[in-house]
Structure formats: structure tokens, C-alpha cells
């Protein structure tokens, strides 16, 4: 299993880091089989798995539950878990309680937190306690209400300078990596060049140290529309619907189950049962 030291070395060597979300045992198993470097158990599970309109309703219990499943499916992959909305915008003691549970009960190797400001002290606090932290700047989904929706961040010089400053603060606080979401590719390159820790982009261009996408978006599974930055590499939901539709049709016409999918009893036993007739 790769560790934070390996990810730092990959940045230094210019080797891109791959990251993908997973939320359950089968998806984690497939992601590990595909040799993805790092798994993110994102609070995006609220939208793509649980059907919420945003990530806000996701709880610490949800994150623990899904992290456990992912760890069972991917025993040899570094797993980062999101701290959900309002689980770290509380007292440091409460933040540590939530963080400890996700790490100890869920099995996460690192935690991800969104934003800067007061979150910087949280990164420092958790890091000093021995919990690796991944920072997240740019479009931070837990704050879409304040940001005015899902919009590209850092498009003007002033806000771009603020993101650069915040990125440096995250690194200084001890973050082991930084996710940059929906920022101009030029800005992402500047930040990546100025930091010693790896940057993982999602909608941040190619001049970052790695990329992350949502599992369901990448394979087109249960999603109606995807963001501009998503490239869909396959469309499994079309195949799934096709297979289920064929099953329905075959059941309705009594084609399924054929003999090969059924069990039989010996003829003498059948005769002994009501003389081979139904009772």
C-alpha cells in the first residue's frame, strides 16, 4: 500500500497520482484491482449513493459505515475519508471525537476537510494528534450555499491570490495533500509549483500532481448528468438497464428460469411424492 511518503515521492518524480471515490465493498474492490493509488470515501456519497440533493445531510455515522465497507474491499489501498458537514466546525474536542471515530472505527488512513480560515487550525490540531489530513480548496461542496452554487473559483486575480495564500497555509498546518476543485488550470499550476505537498485536481486542469473523479461519474452509473470536467470512460448503466429489462421480459414470458438454472429430484423420489402427482 502506498503511503503519504510515497505520494510525496511521486510528486517529486513527476509521477501522476490517481485517486477515485469508492463507497462500498464492490466498488472499492474494483478500484483496487484497477491499481488506483488512493481511494476517497467522499461525502459525495450523499448524492450519488443516498440520493440527497447535496452533501449536507451526510453524517459521521454514514462516513464510518461506508469507510468500513471500502476498507473491506480495498485492503491494500490508501483510503482518505471526508469529514462531513459541521463535523469539524465545532469545538476542537468535538472535532477530535468525530475524527477519532472515523479513523478508529471506520479505518480511514487520512481525513479530508474543506476550506481554509478556521479550518487551518483544525488541520494543525489533527496533524499534531497524528491524524493525516488532506485539505480541499476551490469549490468546496459543503459551502455551495455561501459560494453561490457550483461555480469555478479563483477566476479573478484577487480570489486567485487568496487561494494561493490559503494553499500555503494548509501546507504549513501539516496537510499531506491538497485537493483543488473547479479552479482555472493556470491557477492550479501555480499552486502545484509552489507547494511541496501533492495537489490532486478535480476540474483543475492537467498541471497538478494527480487527478480525482467520482466513481459513478467516471463509469456513468446512476447519474443523469455530469460536470464539465468529467470524462466518462464507459457507460455501465446502459448495460445494467439492458440486462434488467431482458430479465423482466423473460420472466413475463416464462423463458426464465430455463432448466439449466433449476434443480430436479430423482424420478423415484418424485413418484414417491403423491405418486408423482401434486397433492
Swiss-Prot record:
Q: What is its EC number?
A: 2.1.2.11
Active site located where? Answer: 181 (proton acceptor)
Q: Where in the cell is it found?
A: Cytoplasm
Q: Kind of enzyme, top EC level?
A: transferase
Per the entry, the cofactor note is: Binds 1 Mg(2+) ion per subunit.
State a GO cellular component annotated for this protein. cytoplasm
Pathway field = Cofactor biosynthesis; (R)-pantothenate biosynthesis; (R)-pantoate from 3-methyl-2-oxobutanoate: step 1/2
Instruction: Please verify whether the record's keywords include Metal-binding.
Output: yes
Residues binding 3-methyl-2-oxobutanoate, per UniProt: 43-44, 82, 112
Instruction: Give the domain of life.
Output: Bacteria
**What are the protein's UniProt keywords?**
Cytoplasm, Magnesium, Metal-binding, Pantothenate biosynthesis, Transferase
Report the transmembrane regions from the record.
Answer: none
Question: Which amino acids does the record list as binding Mg(2+)?
Answer: 43, 82, 114
Q: What is its main location?
A: cytoplasm
Quaternary organization: Homodecamer; pentamer of dimers.
Main function: Catalyzes the reversible reaction in which hydroxymethyl group from 5,10-methylenetetrahydrofolate is transferred onto alpha-ketoisovalerate to form ketopantoate.
* Family in the record: Belongs to the PanB family.
State what protein this is by name: 3-methyl-2-oxobutanoate hydroxymethyltransferase
Amino acid at each position: 500500500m502506498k503511503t503519504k511518503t510515497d505520494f510525496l515521492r511521486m510528486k517529486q518524480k513527476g509521477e501522476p497520482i490517481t485517486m477515485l471515490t469508492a463507497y462500498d465493498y464492490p466498488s472499492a474492490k474494483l478500484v483496487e484491482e484497477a491499481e488506483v493509488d488512493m481511494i476517497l470515501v467522499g461525502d459525495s456519497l450523499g448524492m450519488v449513493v443516498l440520493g440527497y440533493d447535496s452533501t449536507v445531510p451526510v453524517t459521521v455515522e454514514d462516513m464510518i459505515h461506508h469507510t468500513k465497507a471500502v476498507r473491506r474491499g480495498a485492503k491494500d489501498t490508501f483510503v482518505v475519508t471526508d469529514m462531513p458537514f459541521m463535523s469539524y466546525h465545532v469545538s476542537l474536542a468535538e472535532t477530535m471525537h468525530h475524527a477519532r471515530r472515523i479513523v478508529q472505527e471506520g479505518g480511514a488512513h487520512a481525513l479530508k476537510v474543506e476550506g481554509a480560515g478556521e479550518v487551518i487550525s483544525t488541520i494543525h490540531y489533527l496533524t499534531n494528534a497524528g491524524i493525516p489530513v488532506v485539505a480541499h480548496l476551490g469549490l468546496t461542496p459543503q459551502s455551495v450555499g455561501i459560494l453561490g452554487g457550483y461555480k469555478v473559483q479563483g477566476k479573478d486575480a484577487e480570489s486567485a491570490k487568496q487561494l494561493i495564500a490559503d494553499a500555503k497555509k494548509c501546507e504549513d498546518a501539516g496537510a499531506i495533500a491538497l485537493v483543488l476543485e473547479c479552479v482555472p488550470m493556470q491557477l492550479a499550476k501555480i499552486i502545484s509549483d509552489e507547494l511541496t505537498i501533492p495537489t490532486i485536481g478535480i476540474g483543475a486542469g492537467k498541471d497538478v500532481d494527480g487527478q480525482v473523479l467520482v466513481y459513478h461519474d467516471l463509469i456513468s452509473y446512476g447519474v443523469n448528468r455530469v460536470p464539465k470536467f468529467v470524462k466518462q470512460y464507459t457507460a455501465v448503466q446502459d448495460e445494467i438497464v439492458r440486462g434488467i429489462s431482458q430479465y423482466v421480459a423473460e420472466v413475463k414470458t416464462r423463458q426464465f428460469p430455463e432448466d439449466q438454472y433449476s434443480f430436479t429430484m430423482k424420478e423415484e423420489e418424485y413418484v414417491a411424492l403423491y405418486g408423482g402427482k401434486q397433492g
